[in-house]
Amino acid sequence: IFDAPQGLIVVDTGRSPMHAQAILDYAKQRHRPIAAIVNSHWHLDHTTGNFDIRQAFPNAKVYASTAIEGALVGFLNNGRAQGDKVLTDTKTSEGQKAQLLRGRYRVDHPDTLRPTNPVMRSGRVTIAGRRLEVHLAKFAATEGDVWIYDPASRTAIVGDLVVGLVPFMDTACADGWSKALDEVAAVPFQTVIPGHGDPMSRADFLSWRKAYNDFVA
């Protein structure tokens, strides 16, 4: 979460109600509105909370790539049959069912998943009055991944281009992902915030990039 002159900038909003509520609680504690959301990519564990936040702050802008459009008619739509199996499986907990239905509702009502301000190319962008470097990586972890470099804090927020676990390849292009990691390495960051896992130093990131390239070689 970034401070900006016009309010808070939230990068990714999580999946569960607890994720969204934690963000809303933080805004309340700070006595600041949420002015903008940046979605690093369309995966529902990064975007489902858009609905909750925009209910509370309907004027919040959403910055994201347009890759959600292909996902809605492709990956997310194709996963519906698998979701039906999970919902009818007696081993599925009520909590898991509620989470799946929450995500499905967002897919069926996708307005809050779509960007109000589409990111079409990399460049410097003023978001809620704060100047940030917004990058678009095409055909990487998804068809369009958005990552941010903040020169003031020398922090790169990269979504699932970096994760603490094994990379999720189901929606990925391995070569494009490797190129995106090279683009991240080219900025003078001190800290990387991954899509999952703990913050990384530059040395940690370079080690992860090498492991990724070895993994897909």
What are these regions (language model features)?
Residues 1-29, 146-160:
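Conserved beta-strand hairpin/beta-sheet module of binuclear metal-dependent hydrolase folds
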Residues 2, 12, 27, 41, ...:
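Divalent metal-coordination and catalytic microenvironments
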Residues 11-14, 35-43, 63-66, 156-159, ...:
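Active-site neighborhood of phospho(di)ester-bond hydrolases with catalytic His/Asp-centered motifs
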Residues 17-18, 42-47, 69-72, 141-144, ...:
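Active-site environment of divalent metal-dependent phosphoester hydrolases
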Residues 18-64, 187-188:
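Active-site metal-binding motif and surrounding structural segment of the metallo-beta-lactamase
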Residues 73-137, 143, 151-152, 181:
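Metallo-beta-lactamase
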Residues 131-188:
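Active-site-proximal loop/helix segments of hydrolase catalytic cores
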Residues 149, 155, 175-217:
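Divalent-metal (often Zn2+) His-rich catalytic cores of metallo-beta-lactamase-fold enzymes
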